[in-house]
Structure formats: structure tokens, C-alpha cells
From Swiss-Prot:
The keyword Cell inner membrane does not apply. It is a peripheral membrane protein. The gene is MON1. Residues 93-102, 135-148 have a biased composition (Basic and acidic residues). One of its GO terms (biological process) is vesicle-mediated transport. Disulfide bonds: none annotated. Keywords: Autophagy, Endosome, Membrane, Protein transport, Transport, Vacuole. It comes from Cryptococcus neoformans var. neoformans serotype D (strain B-3501A) (Filobasidiella neoformans). It is found in: Endosome, Multivesicular body membrane; Prevacuolar compartment membrane; Vacuole membrane. This is Vacuolar fusion protein MON1. In complex with CCZ1, is required for multiple vacuole delivery pathways including the cytoplasm to vacuole transport (Cvt), autophagy, pexophagy and endocytosis. The MON1-CCZ1 complex acts at the fusion of vesicles with the vacuole, through its regulation of the SNARE complex during the coordinated priming and docking stages of fusion, and particularly at the stage of tethering/docking. InterPro entries: FUZ/MON1/HPS1_longin_1, FUZ/MON1/HPS1_longin_2, FUZ/MON1/HPS1_longin_3, Mon1. Residues 73-90 have a biased composition (Low complexity).
Amino acid sequence: MTSESEPNTSLPFSPIQQTLPATPSRSTSQVSMVSAEALLSHSSPTKQLTPSHRSSLPSALPYNTLLNAPAGSPALRARASTASSSRAPSVLDDARVEHNDSETQVLEITPPMDNYELDGGSDHTSLPSDASSIKGKEKQRSNDRNEIETVGAGGEMALPSGDARKGLKELVRRSTTADKGYGGHDHRRLSEKLSQTDENLQILITQSDKMSYSPRLYYVLTNAGKPVFCSHTRPSEDDVTNLMGVAQALISIFADDDDRLRYIIKGNHRVAFLLKAPLYLFCVSDWGEPEHVLRLQLEYIHLQILSVVSSTQLLRLFQRRSNADLSTLLEGTEPFLSNLIDCSQYDFSFLTSTLQPLRMAPALRDTSAAALMPPSKFKDLLYVLLIAGGHIVTVLRPRKHSIHPSDLHLLLNTIASSSALRTTETWLPICFPKFNPSGFVHAYISYVLEDVGLVFVSADREAFEDLRVWKDMVLEKLEQDKTLSRIQEAIPLHPYTISSVGCPGLRHFIYKSRQHVQITQPIWEAPYEDGSTNQKRLVTTYQKLHDAVHAKSGQASALKLVYISTEHEACLVWATKPFELYITVSPQLSKSAVVAAANNVAKWVLAEEGRIFLKDAPVF
């Protein structure tokens, strides 16, 4: 399993190439076993977790690559404290269909395209040569040999020790059967076809109705097997403790061979693991999504924990006591983790490491930013944010500094998860793992209206009073020309419907601007209402398309165009250097009509770019 980072994961304010930390990859193992049924049990209680006290932790990093500044600079000092008060038809001509013995059909289509309009132009990225394709085949076969799928004897699994541990390990190794794909499909055969193809556009017709789309289950434990968090409430704490013990034992079996357990497949269920010593995280899902999607969600859970307990605190705690209990430090954070999990299920900005700012008039955004320009006396001020309706209005940052989208996701999630943060002035110590995982910054949070808030992030833990005085000055500027009331009026206008594009047959789309590292999408409408099976199916399809254009499942190369069609809908992803576009249309639309719809959406977003994206954010 290989994982490739997003081409650009910084905000428009500066070019950052770093994304969520990739899991170290050595040899990987894929395991499917009847005895893993314990991992699929829904019977486990919720462990409540959260912060109590944080000590000052100087940064141990000699250099911060995200901010291009020495870690010892004033802006990077990490301090902690407690809170104080168209020729479209020509594109899809001459297609050929290739069948295999699974339920999946692959339709390869030429010619390749990578231009601003889907019209079969010649401006495109060259495809791999035959030699590179052969190399990709050999690499895929090598990866296949490293994957193991096992069906063991039924019954309960006891925690292994000594010879029993070796016996379980040998059972896993030798009980290899024919490899079957996730959700009943030969996904490795399909992945090999994706790797070997010399075309840029493929049509994948898959059967996804077998997925039941049960709520995903998330677990966090220590490397000693102690429970830290589980995402659902069940009556017996013993059940979750035993479950964590089984997971810890399975992870340890492969760790003995310097290997990392990445996932287990059992029927339609997938159990994905993320190992971030001293914490282990895993998730159980039957949605049929690519493995990297679950691992990315686990990454965000890990980052949310680090926002409360920095990596330095965590390591020191477990160095002193290997079986330490995190429940005291994490007491009260369960709402933060639960809200993060809920948002990550359907919010595409998590998968793409982007933001979706408030849709508003460009002039109003510029006026707001001008009122937020800080005085020069704030030497340790890092970021200034204006938030409305849970979305960013504008962000100001120091020159040569930047902020990673995942850090902003953590901040916005923390604010959204606590009503207290939105009703009183707050001085919040928080760790931004992408900024500095070793220590804390401090955020002054004040909601000047019910749904409009100011956030000032500083490295100076003593700056509360100064920032409080400055907030009053900013508020006065925003009220002088009624900017504040106009921002409040823009909040209900932020959502828009698919009819705004004016394209018959178009049901939904997601547009990612690579330049601005932001996305836009209409609201979910029928038949994709919030929480419906149709919405879950479509989100999973988008995730598969994202996987294909980023080659995150071992493909030899990334694709530029991928089209998935089922009896319910047809979806197309179009990846270019400036943007990625995901559209959903009626399955009855012709191929030329689908291409025309993609062009229409791209043109509409270009015309609305000033309103839907935050461009040219000010610096100080």
C-alpha cells in the first residue's frame, strides 16, 4: 500500500508541500480472519477523555519546515498555561470494453486530456511508457506477494503469549487463501488493471449496493493495550478493554518482524490501523472506501489528541510509566473527538486537506481584512481569524509564515464542539501539530455576535489583556461602516443549490482549487439528503475517485479522468494542475453530456471565484 501526498496542502497564503504525516511504511500485511470478529463487535463503552493541566514545553524542533522559520524564533515559542478569563462528443469516441470475471467492468477510453476544457485538446500530461507499465506490473505483483488474507478457525481469540503467540502468528502466516477484494470484488485485480493501463480515462462500473453503511467505529488505545477512546457507547467496559487487548496483540505480532499491521478484511468489513506510538488507533467500516480514507480519519483523531496533549508531553508521560492512563489528561475531550468524527464522514475538506471559506462579496472580505490588520507592537502574534457561521471569512498571518489546513480544522472543530467557547471570552492553550507538535500556542476567542467570532493566536501566553484591548478596537472598526452586520447577513447566503449552475442532469459537484487549497460544493439535496444511504454511497464513490487520481492504492500512476457509473448515478473526476473536479449526474446522461456538465461547472466556478474562495489573504 503506497500513499502519495497531495500536490499542495497549504492555504493560499503560502506554498506548503507537507500534508498529514504519512505512516511509515515497511513491509505491510493484509489479514482476514474469523477470529478477528472481536474487532467487529459493536459492544463497547465510551471512554471519556480530556485535558486538565499543561506545563510549558519549549520546542525541541531545530527547524520548522511549515513556517520556514527557526524553531527558536519568538513566533515559534511554545508556551502553555491554564485559561484565564465545446467539442465534447469527440472526447469519448471509440471506446473499448474489457470484461473480467468479477462484478466490475473496466472501460478504457482515449485520448488523454489535461486541459482547461474537456474537448480532446492536445495539451496533456504524457502517459507512462510500455517499459514503465511493465515495471508497474512487477511492482504490483511484488506488493501482492506481501499481502496476506487469512481465514482462521472460528471461535474466540485468547491473548497470545510465548509459544501461543508464535502459534497465532504462524496461523496467520500459513492460512492463506485466494485473495478476494473488499466488499466481494477482486480489488487487487482491479488495482492491477488501473496500474497497467496506458489510458488516462477509465469507466469503472461497480456494484456498491452490498455495503450496509453502518456507523464507523473508532478506537484509540495505548501501546500497552489500555483504552483511551471509543466512538460509541456500550454497557460493558470489559468488552472494550478485551477488544483493545486483542488489537494490541495483533499489532504486536507483526511488530516482532519489524512489520506494521495496516488493515484486516473480514467479509464486507475493513479494520484499518494507524500506529503512532505510544498510541494505536483503529477503525471498523463496512462502507467500501479505500483504505487510505480510514487512515486519514485516524490521523485527524490523533492530531486532535495532540492538540490537547502535545507529543512531548505524551512521550514523557509514557517514558516515565509505560502503562500510563491518559484518562486524566484527556478528560472532557470526548465531544471534540466525536464532533471531528461526525464532520469527517461527509466533509470533503478533510480528505483533500483544504478549507471551504464563507461565500461572500470580495469587497466585503477585503474590508473585513483591513479592519483586522494588527498593530506592530504584537511581536508574537501568529494568526488573526474572522469566523462566521463556522466558516473562515479571512485569515491574516505574518509575512513568510503560513498555517496548515489541518491545524485550522482542529481549531474550528474545537470551537464548534464547545458552546462555552462561543459565549464567553476565552484564552485557550492549544497545540497545532503541523505548526509545532512539541508545545502550545494560545488562542484568544471572542464571539462578538452569536455566529461571528474573532480569534487571535499568539505565542505569548501573557498577551490576553493586550489582545482583549485590541479586540475592542477591531470591533469598533467593523461596526463603523456596518461591516459586521453585512457579514452576519452573508451567513445564510453561504449555502447554494445545484440549480445555481444551471446545468440539466447535474446532481452534485465538488471543486478543489489547488492554487488556493480550498473547495466549494453545493448543499446536499435529494436524493442525497444528509445521513441518507444515497449520500453515504456517493461520498464513498467520491473517495474512490480521489484514490484513483492520487494513486493511493498502489497504482503505478495517477489518472487524470475517471468515470464511475451505477444504476443510481454517474460520477466523473477531472484532475488538472489548477483544479480537481468531481461531478455527479443522472446515469441516463450520455457521455458527451457528462463532459459538457464538467465544462459548465468549471466555467461557473471560474466566474464565481472571487465570492467562493479566499484569495490574496493579507500579511503583517
